[in-house]
Amino acid sequence: MKQVLWFIKTYFTFVILFSIQKPFFMIMEKASATQPIDNIWSEIPTVMWYGLSLDLSMAGYLTALPGLLFIATIWFRKEIIRPILNAYYILASFLVSITFVLNAGLYPYWNFPLDSTPLYYFFTSPKDALASVGGLYIFFALLITVLLTIAVWFALRMPHTQKRYSSRYSNYGFGDFGSGRRTRYSDIEHHRMRHSLILLLLTALLFIPIRGGFTVSTTNTGKAYFSQNAFLNHAAVNPMFSLFESLTHQEDFASQYRYMSEEEANKLFAQMVSSSDQNTYPLLNEEARKNGKPDILIIIMESFANDIMPSVGTHKDVAVCLDSIAKKGIFFPRFYSNTFRTDRGLVAVLSGYPAQPTTSIMRYPAKSAQLPSLARSLAKAKHYGNAYYYGGDVDFANQRSWLVSQGYERIISDSDFPIEDKLSKWGVHDHIVANRLLADIKKEQNAKQPMLRVFQTSSSHEPFDVPYSRLKDKRLNAFAYTDSVIGNLLREYSKLPRWKNTLVLLVADHVGAYKEHLDNFDRSRYQIPLIMTGGAIARPMNVKLIGSQHDIAATLLGQLGIPHKDFLFSKNMLSDATPKFAFFDVPDAFGMVSEENSIIYDNKSKKVVYDKGKKGYNLKRGMAYLQKLYDDLSAK
């Protein structure tokens, strides 16, 4: 069973090596922290704990090949396998060492964990990449890398530097075959097969730490994010994992969607963006405007479409609560989603940043950390506190890292609920999360600080298993369930004193699940509800202006008199000085809707697939908008 012990020792050697990198990094890079840390030593155990999932995953990747080679030593002479294993250990030692050195060396300049960016700069222009560091710096970096490589290789080799001993199967990994009494060939085969199966099982089990368990989300750098202090999050990230994640997701954004010259794109784009709040139509009542600090609750509804609302859609018995709320509140019937996926819709709503057709900025923590933030803007201008409620796995699609970088102080997710509440594939049902949200609101009724709370629903998603049975159609019943949860939540909230100074905003993340066969080239595929209610609104109204999700941030901040110049793509829909249009995209197409024209363009076929109104009016505008979006994405 030597090979099994070698396997276990190899795996945990990698884990230990990755773990001890963290305190060294923290001590060396403390001066580079952009936020103060009172006691660096007390933070080390927490950083190591939160970074452990990435360390376990990376160790799994690095142990997979040795696992297979250990099996080979059972069937072939070790003289054949040992050189291969040695070469692999040298390579692995170098990679572990160089990623640590690069991460530590570059962090003071870039203040984010190692990713593919330095490789991109180095291979495109080595001279420029090295121009900012001196020869002595490079020499010491190389020297440290070599010394660390030797040390790591020695640590990995230690389990294999064992005194040779004799037993009857040595030449096949079990001792010296042929010494002592002769052994039946079937006995040898039996031992080989048994030990091979054990090692094969252990190697296969590496899938668990590599993936990060059996939850919906897979391991990603966002799992290490836990603190409002960015330095602590960065210290917890495994640099080797971060680099390989970035390499496998790397795209050259600057070369995508090049429809026109930069000059022409800039000219058209300038006509479509504005940070003006001139002559903004007020939605809040006089008391709320005077106070200027209403509590804000944003409910982001999974997959809701206008079509399931009785007054504007074809279904008269699904979103009945939402329909009632819209009639008594402020309803935007010509509002559009930016996208077809939740992660992109969340960024559009809360960061005012349009979705991208071929990627999601949430996948890139270094880029998503640079996004503007509704939560941060409210906190900075009017000292809002905040909390985010979601019954699912907040590590899915790197959502946690984005939320933390957005400045959310409390993130309540599936891990904050008892195991008996996790009854759905996506975690906790909406009514349980709503009850937790309501309990927190009641608890904080007398707080002086205004609050931004975000409630992201999840139950109206496949497989549509909900604790509710009003409608026969499983999909529609799931929407009816979430609709009832929202209705009950707002009814109970309205009984509280704080309601009179509360603005509630309800919006879908995207259209999905219903209808069953959605057409990406149909404009109705992107029409979603935007509703405002609460004691702080002036009166019920129907706002027939055109807008989309990324306009919410500027529109909301405009109502509160808060500047929003950092939200480049977001515009105040209620200002008479801003252009009125909606933009959306899916792989690989984009659409733009305005009073003049509605258009959808298929990038793959290079054809306009939907064109209504003034023919082609929005084609160049949409192209310029998408081109500038990818310019901005590349620059982050």
Predicted regions and their residues:
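Alpha-helix initiation and N-capping motif
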Residues: 17, 116, 126, 237-241, ...
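Long, well-ordered, tryptophan-enriched scaffold segments
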Residues: 138-144, 263-269, 403
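Short alpha-helical "patches" and their helix-cap loops
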Residues: 80-84, 255-265, 361-366, 570-572
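Short coil/turn linker and secondary-structure boundary residues
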Residues: 117, 124, 238, 253-260, ...
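The feature marks either
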Residues: 229, 236-241, 245-285, 292, ...
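Transmembrane and membrane-interface helices of multi-pass
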Residues: 2-253
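Solvent-exposed soluble domains appended to multi-pass membrane proteins
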Residues: 270-636
